[in-house]
Amino acid sequence: MAFFNIFRGPKPGGPEAVRARLEGAMAKRRLRGWNPPLENINALVASGGPRLLARSRELVVTNGYAANACEAFAANLVGDGIKPSSLITDAALRDRVQKLWLAWTDEADADGLTDFYGLQAMVAREMFVAGECFVRLRPRRAEDGLLVPLQLQLLQSEMLPFEKTETDPNGNRIRCGIEFDLIGRRVAYHFRRRHPGDSTDQRVAVPDTVRVPAEDVLHIYRPIDAGQIRGLPHIAPAMVRLFLLDQYDDAELDRKKTAAMFAGFITKTAPEDPMMGEGEADSDGAAIASLEP
């Protein structure tokens, strides 16, 4: 009979066990003000994503703790760069492929600022700051003079508008800048033509966004909820505490600076006495006075 006991339901634990399990749902005095909305992660990202992203970028630039955390995250994620190793058994072909790969890594950046391994570090930093990064595959022409006619262009999270949520004329849904077909597959990304915060890029009037097929885009992010379509800054859970800690540090430094100042009152017994009890002035007109606490 003991064998069948494992298929039976658990024995009731009594009122105390039920109370312990549902304590988080209580609305008594301690938890009366805790009423978070039950929203989908995508709705939260669409409404608060731009402000969260702006605050995250400011913290990483102005807060030393956040800046160090960003660099540590990138160093632990990619280090000096993830280097692939060929599994081709033909030694001659493997050497040719390896030389071609090494040549391409120096030309991989579409902006011409760094190499393939530097791009990995930039992606890692964007993952920490913005929670996501977009890599656009840019095929090149033969006259561009590249050994491999392909380059990678990094696009920040701001380049894909959070507010672009609409229905395309073809029936596809665009959510936070990402176009989905009728069965929920990603078919395109609607990128801005220029960064919304870059006042130095004053181009002629062009459409606000450009449609890029999904097969030409790598969307790198870590979803934390099922169905999540955009990334969240990795610093988001500690953002408020870091901001308040920064204010506390400034206030504490000001308090210490004020406390370290030496203050006193200057008194004299007669109007004709020297203000500080100094002696006679020297030939340069300067006099020396002593001051004690």
Residue ranges and their predicted role:
Residues M1-S86:
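N-terminal-proximal low-complexity accessory segments that begin disordered
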Residues T62-P223:
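Structured, mid-chain assembly/scaffold modules that mediate subunit interfaces
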Residues V217-P293:
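Extended, charged amphipathic alpha-helical segments
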Residues G14, G112-D115, T165, P233, ...:
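Alpha-helix capping and helix-coil boundary motifs
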Residues F7-R30, T200-R203, P274-L291:
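Intrinsically disordered, low-complexity linkers and terminal tails enriched in Pro/Gly
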Residues R8, E179-D181, D249, T267:
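Generic, ordered loop/turn and secondary-structure boundary motif
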Residues I41, G48, S56, A69-C70, ...:
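Generic structural signal of hydrophobic/aromatic residues within well-ordered alpha-helices
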Residues A46-G49, L53-A54, D90, D115-A121, ...:
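Extended interaction regions within the primary functional domain
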